[in-house]
């Protein structure tokens, strides 16, 4: 009788926990940021700074900087990538921002996200650029930081053959 009661309590606890987790951990869907796609910042001597990060922090560098490969949480069979890149301090790529950095956010539903932002009075800095490994557009946040939004195509990005940090 004690074993039967214990088994019943364990089953009840399992199903209550499972049911609660299903009700409370719904995946976030819709147009949104899903993660960090890249961290970009200016440097006086990008080549020397890349060499320093490689030598002392063990970061493998490619043409644009370091790529970090990871597996996506909702489907661990899918790869994702985050880029760490240096730009010359004279770059115009971060304009109209005057900041020394720019963050690239990975997004889902870029077109709808842009429509939602436009409805809120937020206009993109440029038009959507589509390339094989995704779509990009830039916006400004209220404090003058330029933000890059990237709807990635990670399958195509992986084919670019970068020496990824894993």
For every predicted segment, state its role.
Residues 7-15:
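Bacterial N-terminal signal peptides
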């Amino acid at each position: 009788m004690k074993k039967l009661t214990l088994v019943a309590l364990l089953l009840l606890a399992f199903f209550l926990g499972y049911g609660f987790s299903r009700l409370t951990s719904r995946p976030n869907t819709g147009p949104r940021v899903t993660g960090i796609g890249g961290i970009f910042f200016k440097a006086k001597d990008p080549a020397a700074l890349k060499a320093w990060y490689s030598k002392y922090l063990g970061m493998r560098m490619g043409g644009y900087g370091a790529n970090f490969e990871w597996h996506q949480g909702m489907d661990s069979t899918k790869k994702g990538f985050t880029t760490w890149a240096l730009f010359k301090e004279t770059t115009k790529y971060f304009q109209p921002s005057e900041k020394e950095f720019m963050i690239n956010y990975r997004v889902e539903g870029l077109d709808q996200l842009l429509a939602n932002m436009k409805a809120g009075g937020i206009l993109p800095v440029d038009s959507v650029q589509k390339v094989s490994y995704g779509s990009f557009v830039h916006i400004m946040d209220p404090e003058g930081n330029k933000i890059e939004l990237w709807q990635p195509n990670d399958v195509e990005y992986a084919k670019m053959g970068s020496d990824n940090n894993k």
